[in-house]
Amino acid sequence: MKLQILLLALVLIAVEANAVKQGINATIPALIVFGDSIMDTGNNNNLPTLLKCNFPPYGKDYPGGDATGRFSDGRVPSDLIAEKLGLAKTLPAYMNSYLKPEDLLKGVTFASRGTGYDPLTAKIMSVISVWDQLIYFKEYISKIKRHFGEEKAKDILEHSFFLVVSSSNDLAHTYLAQAHRYDRTSYANFLADSAVHFVRELHKLGARKIGVFSAVPVGCVPLQRTVFGGFFTRGCNEPLNNMAKQFNARLSPALDSLDKELDGVILYINVYDTLFDMIQHPKKYGFDVADKGCCGKGLLTISYLCNSLNPFTCSNSSSYIFWDSYHPSERAYQVIVDNLLDKYLSKVY
């Protein structure tokens, strides 16, 4: 009898160790994501917008080499985080018409390339605003209740990890259309306040474990370097980076206050410093190129300009921080996720 108990204990220990190794966390039923292209896994595919990438060479390093609508050579952070949580290797786009009810259980992404906290951003780009993403989230919860019951919906709301990722399109594009109303500082503050309002609304809908990404050093993406960084030097667009820093300076303490005010956990996730350090010191992270993308010549190549007719696309995208002139490669995303996820998840679960 003692031997049987000992063997059972060893089996349980082995199972638990394997679960940890595989990234399985039974306390996290799903990953729910809102935001822009960083987390979009194909929601724009059927929209009347030019901001699409469901064609080669996008997806060349994705399983099967499929161009699924992810703005990368492979997977994006929503996929990588879902895998790290032990949920799935890829996170489905909510707008995917082939989704079955059971596909909703591990989570979805509502993210749409080109959107932002400023409602004008999505309107200009003809994409899904973050506010409309909340409407789709309500629909998602209704589907969960209908197919799997109230208790399952309650479990997803209370224990899932919710991620909100936006601001780059607002800062880099929409500000130019709003400059008659705001200076750079006041616009960054407006965006941060809008982000806090979004989190409040998400919390009202039942979400209790929410992480919000900081703005990134969008002034250092290859396209910004090419257009604003000087013809020969191609340095970062520092005024744009300063706007991102102002957004972060406003957002971080506001989310800390919200975390104290509301039940659950609300986290500010500092992505800016990690990505900026990668761009400034690429060799430190195993990259060769940080100032241009792999696709095409990597200077202004994005969306339809990054296509299979372009003969200049690199053969080894993992040596580049950026895949196209705006979006990181899968390997760069993996470095960011590995550097940040465990640190912040430990504050939630």
From Swiss-Prot:
Where this protein primarily resides, as one coarse class? secreted
Q: Which residues does the record list as glycosylated?
A: 25, 316
**Annotated signal sequence range:** 1-19
For this UniProt entry, the molecular function terms from Gene Ontology, in alphabetical order, are:
lipase activity
Per the UniProt record, which EC number(s) apply here?
3.1.1.-
Q: Where in the cell is it found?
A: Secreted
> Which keywords label this protein?
Glycoprotein, Hydrolase, Lipid degradation, Lipid metabolism, Secreted, Signal
Looking up InterPro entries in the UniProt record yields:
GDSL (IPR001087), GDSL_lipolytic_enzyme (IPR050592), Lipase_GDSL_AS (IPR008265), SGNH_hydro_sf (IPR036514), SGNH_plant_lipase-like (IPR035669)
Listed under GO cellular component are:
extracellular region
A single Gene Ontology biological process assigned to it is: lipid catabolic process
Where in the sequence is the active site? 37, 324, 327
What broad class of enzyme is this? hydrolase
Known CDD domains for this protein? SGNH_plant_lipase_like (cd01837)
Q: Which family does it belong to?
A: Belongs to the 'GDSL' lipolytic enzyme family.
Q: What is this protein called?
A: GDSL esterase/lipase At1g58525
Q: Which organism is it from?
A: Arabidopsis thaliana
